Every structure is written in structure tokens, then in C-alpha cells.
Regions:
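Hydrophobic positions on the alpha1 helix immediately C-terminal to the Walker A/P-loop
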Residues: 16, 20
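ATP-dependent small-molecule kinase phosphotransfer cores
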Residues: 31-90, 103-104, 115, 128, ...
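P-loop (Walker A) phosphate-binding loop of NTP-binding proteins
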Residues: 8
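Hydrophobic anchor at the beta1->P-loop junction of P-loop NTPases
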Residues: 5
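Small-molecule kinase domains that catalyze NTP-dependent phosphoryl transfer to phosphate-bearing small molecules
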Residues: 118-169, 190-198
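Conserved phosphate-donor/acceptor-positioning beta-strand/loop module used by diverse small-molecule
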Residues: 92-116, 120-129
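Short, charged/polar connector segments at secondary-structure boundaries
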Residues: 180-271
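Conserved lysine of the Walker
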Residues: 13
């Protein structure tokens, strides 16, 4: 099985990939490492490297070609491609996007002691730089490949990493990947997400306010029912997405009950 994993900066991709490697026996192919090494060799930041790649395609071509070649030559191996665009270049894969709130992403990179990313003096600086890097990458992918990187419909699984442990997320990823593999045994791979597109967000990402005592009492029965849920609800909630924020269109009571019951995830549909 081939899994391609990408997502927001600070979403924990590397940590989750390491768990999938250690616990489930996947081999990691990280093109992000190649990009960081190129930036270090040129004595520039990752952001500057991304900006340079807007005008010099040889770096992108090198990464893209290597990714496609490895996937073709190792179809029978369990490989995770930790790469921004591997979902586009690997012909047959379970495509994952890790989502995380900008505030939590900024906190994570501020506290990152691995020495692989730039250091930030304040949380605001981290937020601003993460937003700038995301905008630069988004523009580059649109200009060079005509791809909308942040379009969730590109992926088979979009999963929120804001509130849950990497171990929990890795477990759900493997469950969904196995389900995908079972379905695809009866299908032929085509371009796109193969008609499989699940978006899982934490209830706290959808509603992070305190539920009033009176309302919590009214939701008691639903909360007790939801306490039995181990991974995600079997109901899909319609939401509107605007940048980093989500607004629940219908099903707000279910979201509040899920938050009170500490349900890990809610499936959502973007309207």
C-alpha cells in the first residue's frame, strides 16, 4: 500500500509518519527533507527556497520525478510519501491531508527543538510566517501545476490534528487506509479521489466555547449516547469553511454534544 500524506505546516506529519513506520512497518519517503537540505546548502530559509522555486522549476522537477519513480518501482511495498504533492504524482495511493488550526500550528513550531525549521521570537511572528509560507506554496502550485493544494476534495481523508495525539490519528489513518484498500480491490484507479473523500474534524475545532449548564442538561441523553463513540460519529455535519475558521450550518446541537462527550471526530461536508 502507498500512502501519501501532506497538510498544513505544523500539523505533525513527520511524527505521524514515524508512528506509521514503527508500528505498521511502512517505509518513509520524505521529499520535505530534500527541500530543506537544498535550502541549507544555499544558505537560505525554507520560505526563501519556496519563493526561489516559483521561478526555477528544476528543484520541483527533481522532487516530482523522484517521487513518481519510487512509487512506480515499489508498488508492492508499504510506503508513506511525506510530501506536499505526492498525492498528485503517486499514481495509486491513499491520499491524506492533515489539518491544524493556525494558532496550534504556531505554538508547535515555536516549541519545536529539532532545529529543522526557522525559529520565531513571538507567537504572532510564527503565525505570520506560517501564513506567508502557506500562501507562497499555494501560489506556486497553482502557477506551476494548476493545482489547488488546499482543496479538500483532492484527498481521500482529511483529518484534524489540532487536539488529538499522533497515536490516535495514526490509528484512524490505518483504519481508513485499510477500508480504502478493500474498496479499491474492486475498482480501477482513476484521476482524483476515487469517489472517497472523508473530512474528520474535532468537535472543539467546530465549537470551542463553553456549553451553558442549562443547554448541557438538555443534551444529556445525546451526550451519553456519544460517549460510546471511539473514533467519529456516524452522522455528517454541514459546515462552511473560511480560511482557518469553520461555521456549522446544521447540526450544532450534535457538535456541542460531541464536544461534551469528548468524541474524537465528526465527519463534515463543506457547503
Amino acid at each position: 500500500m502507498h500512502i501519501t500524506i501532506t497538510g498544513n505546516l505544523g500539523s505533525g506529519k513527520s511524527t505521524i509518519c514515524k508512528i506509521l513506520e514503527d508500528k505498521y512497518g511502512f517505509e518513509i519517503y520524505s521529499t520535505g527533507k530534500v527541500q530543506r537540505e537544498l535550502a541549507r546548502e544555499m544558505n537560505i530559509t525554507t520560505l526563501e527556497m519556496n519563493q526561489l522555486m516559483c521561478s526555477d522549476r528544476k528543484y520541483d522537477t527533481m522532487i516530482d520525478d523522484a517521487t513518481a519513480r519510487i512509487s512506480r518501482e515499489n508498488r508492492d511495498k508499504n510506503i508513506i510519501f511525506d510530501s506536499r504533492l505526492a498525492w498528485h504524482f503517486v499514481e495509486q495511493s491513499f491520499k491524506i491531508f492533515l489539518s491544524v488550526s493556525l494558532n496550534v500550528a504556531a505554538e508547535r513550531v515555536m516549541n519545536d527543538n529539532r532545529g529543522k525549521e526557522e525559529k520565531y521570537a513571538t507567537l504572532k511572528e510564527a503565525r505570520d510566517m506560517l501564513a506567508a509560507r502557506a500562501a507562497t506554496e499555494d501560489k506556486r502550485y497553482k502557477d506551476m501545476y494548476n493545482l489547488n493544494y488546499f482543496d479538500f476534495s483532492n484527498y481521500n481523508l482529511v483529518i484534524d490534528s489540532t487536539y488529538h495525539t499522533p497515536e490516535k490519528i495514526a490509528s484512524i489513518i490505518m483504519q481508513e487506509a485499510k477500508n480504502f484498500e478493500t474498496v479499491m480491490k474492486e475498482k480501477v484507479y482513476e484521476a482524483g479521489n476515487q469517489g472517497i473523500n472523508r473530512i474528520l474534524l474535532s468537535p472543539k475545532r467546530l465549537y470551542n466555547k463553553t456549553v451553558e449548564i442549562a443547554e448541557a442538561a438538555d443534551l444529556k441523553d445525546l451526550v451519553e449516547e456519544y460517549k460510546k463513540v471511539t473514533n467519529y460519529l456516524d452522522k455528517t455535519i454541514a459546515v462552511h469553511k473560511s480560511g482557518d475558521e469553520y461555521t456549522v450550518i446544521n447540526g450544532l446541537l450534535e457538535v456541542k454534544a460531541a464536544a461534551l462527550a469528548e468524541v474524537p471526530y465528526i465527519p463534515v461536508r463543506l457547503d
